[in-house]
Amino acid sequence: MSALVFAVLTALTGPAAFASDTGSAHKLVSYPPSSQLDFSGTLETPAGQHGFLTTGANGHFYFADGKRARFWGINVSSTRLDIPPDQIERVVENFARAGLNMVRLEAIDNRNCLLGKVDSPDSLHFDGRYLDRLDHWMDSLRRHGIYYYLDLLDFRTFKSGDNVLNAREMDRGARPYALYDDYLIQLQQDYAKRLLTHKNPYSGLMPVNDPALAMVEICNEHGFFLYPEKLETLVEPYRTDLRNRWNRWLRDRYGTREKLQAAWGDINGFTVLRDDEDPERLSVDLPLLTRAFANADPMAADIRRAPPRLRDGVQFLTELQRTYLRTMRDYLFSLGLQAPITAVVSNDVAPDIWSVAQECDFTAENWYGDTIKDDPRTPGLRYYSNHNPLREDGPLGVAPFTAGLRWNNKPVVIREWGTIWPNRYRAVSEPELLAYASLQDYDAVLLFGYQTNRAPNGAEADALNDYAFQVDPTVWGLHAIAGQAFLTHAIRSADHTATLVYPPAHLYDWPAHLSELHRASWSVRVQSRVATSRPDASAQTPTGTLSDLQSLRELLNYFGKRGVPISEKSLTTGVWHSDTGQITRYDHDGRLEVSTPTLAILSGELEPGHLYDVGSLHVSTANRFATIVAYSLDGLPLARSRHRVIKMVTRAENSEEQLDRAPKDAPAPWQLTTAGAGPVVTFGSGSIAPTKVWIEPQRVNGKPVPLPLPLLTMDMVSGTWEMELAAGTARLLCDTVEIHGTLHGRDFTTSDEAVVMKFEKKKKLIGITAAKQ
C-alpha cells in the first residue's frame, strides 16, 4: 500500500486553509489540527481575566488572584507573523483547538519585519503594515484565551541612520555592544517604549496594560559569555570603551598597580600583569575567554588566560551585564509594565545565568535535540546528527541542560525547544520534554516553531522545514495531548531536590560549563545557588573536573539510601528512574516510559513483537520506532476512564526527501541531500504483524491480571492513528486507508473517513459507521 499523507487527518478534523501572503499564485496550505480533539474549551477567554502574571515566593508563576499559572505553547517568528488578518485568526483558532495557552512572538525586530525592510536607512521607525498585523496577533490571542510573550532585542540591525558608530561592523543584535554602550541602550529603551505603550486598535489596550501579555524578554541569546570570541574583535570606539571600563573596575577594586600585581601573582615564572599594563593608564587587557582564539604570541595568550585574570574578567563582565539588565528592567517597570521580565543568555555558564536570576523575574533558555551544521566546502548542503535524544544522558541532554536554569528559586521557562527535522527520531521529543519539564516542575514550555507562509529558503508551509512543525504528525501531532498532560500536572514533579552550591570564590571560575552533577536531573529536581556551605550530601559543589562524576555518585547514593529508587548504577546501566517512579529512561535502548494514574507513554526504539507494559498501557507492535500515548481526559485512572484518547505516531518525511550518510570528514554524520516538498508522507502500510493495544490494570488486589482480548489492533506498520473513546463511542482516525483492524474483536477497515463505533456499558459493540466530522 502506498504511503499516505498527514493531510488525511486534516480532512477528517477540519482544515484551516490559507493562501500565502506573498503572492496569489502560491498554493493553499492546510494546517492540520494537532488532534481530533478540540481543547479550546480548556482556555478561559479572554486571556488575562485572573489579572497580571506575577512570580511567587516558591519559584512559580501566579496570577494576581492567586491562581498558579503554567504554560504550554509555541513560537511564531519574524516573517512568519506577516500574514493577513483572516489567516492570523485561523492560525490562532488552530492553536486554541490544541489547547495552547501561550504564544511567543519571536524576532519581530528581524529584517523585513517591524523595523522595516532590510534596505531601510535606519531602524528607528515601525513598519505600519507589520505593526498592524502584530496588533492582530496580540488581540486574537487574547480573545482566544492565549497569553503572549514578547521579545525586545533579537536580531535588530542597527544602522548608520540611527547615528550608531560603525553600525555596519556589528552583527545583528549588536552582540555584545548592546550590553554596555549607553546610546545603544537608549535605542533599546526607545524601541521598548514605542512597542509597549502604543495602543492596539483592536483590543483598545497598550501592551503594558494588557494582562494577556504574560512575559517580556529584554534580549534573546545575548550576553558576554554566549559568544566570548566576539570580545576579541570589537570595533572602535566600543573596544576602547570596554577596556576603559575594565581598567576603572580594576582600579576601584585594587587601588594601585602594585596591589593588582600582588593579587594576580605569577604563572610559569612570569607575572600575570605585564610590565606595560597599568589600570591607571587604562592599559590592562581583558582575559582571553575563548579556547578557539589563536593568539600570535603564545606567552601573551597564557598570561591572558591566567586564572586570576580570568576570574576578575568574568566578574567584571558579569557585573556589567547585571547593570544592563537592571537598567532595562527598571526602565520597563517605569513604563508601567507589569509582566515578568527575563533575558536569555547561556545557561551552561554559571555566572551568566546567575546574573539573570539576580536581576530578572524568571530564567529562560532553549534546548534542541539536533541542530543544523554547515560546511563551507559544500554550500547548500546541511548536516545533522540524526541521533535519538533518548540515548543521550550526559550534561547536554534535555533534563541536565535545562536544569541549569534553576537559580535563586526563580520560575523556569523553556521558551524554545525541538528535535528538528529531518531527524528521524523526532517522535520522542514531545514525550521527553513533557516528562522532564514535569519532573523539574518548569513553568512554561514553548515549541519552536510554526511556519505560516513561504519560508526564506523557498519551502512552503505544507512541507517539513527548519524549525517548523505545523505539518509534522510526529511532533505537532502530539503537541495538544502532551500539553493537556503538562497543564493538568498528569506527571508529578520530583519529590526530592539536589542543590548545586557555588562558593562565591569560585562562581567566576573559567572556563565554565554544565557539570556531571546536572545529570541528577534525570531523577530528582536540581537547583543552583551561591553559598558558602553545604548542609548535607543532597548539596554538592561543581568543580568542572572529573571529580564531579564521583560527586554525582555520592549524590545518587545519598537519595538511594533514603528509599528513593535511584543509585549510581544508572551511570553504567543507562536506566534512569525518576524519584516519583513515574518516568523510566532506558538510555542504552533509546526508550522512554511514563506511567501515571492518568497517562501512559511508550516512546523510542522498540523490539518488534515484544509486549511492553507501561502501567495500564500494554503494547505490542511491528514498528521498530514509535510513540504511543494513552491519556485519561476525565481525570479517572486510565483503566477506569470513560473518556480517553490513544494515539500512535511513527515517522514522517517530505515527499522525495533524501537523508544520506555524510562523508567521514563532514561536520555531522548525516546530510540532507534533498529536502523534498509537501505533502508530508508517513509511510503507513499493511502489516501481517499487528499493533496490539490493551488498557488494563497490571494487578488487581496485588495479583497479576492476564490480558484479555486487545482493546485495539491495527494491521499497519508506520503511519499515524488516533482514537478517542467517550460516552460509549469510539472514533478512530488513521492517515492510511484500507488498514484492517479490530476493536474489542470486531473488524473494521480504515478509509478517508473516521471510523465511529458505539458500545454498550460493558464494551459490547453495537454498530460501526464511517463519518466525517
Task: Show the residue positions of the predicted features.
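Catalytic-core region of carbohydrate-active enzymes that cleave or remodel glycosidic bonds
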Residues: T197-H198, Q321-T342, D348-D370, Y383-R562
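Bacterial N-terminal signal peptides
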Residues: S2-G14
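A general structural signal for short secondary-structure junctions and capping/turn motifs
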Residues: F95, S140, L205-V208, D352-V356, ...
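N-terminal pre-domain segments of enzymes
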Residues: S20-H50
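Active-site mouth of glycoside hydrolases
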Residues: P46-D330, S334-C360
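Long, low-hydrophobicity ectodomains and other hydrophilic envelope-associated domains
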Residues: T488, S493-Q773
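Signal peptide processing junction and immediate N-terminal pro/mature segment
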Residues: G14-A19, V208
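Short, charged, surface-exposed secondary-structure boundary motifs
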Residues: I372-T378
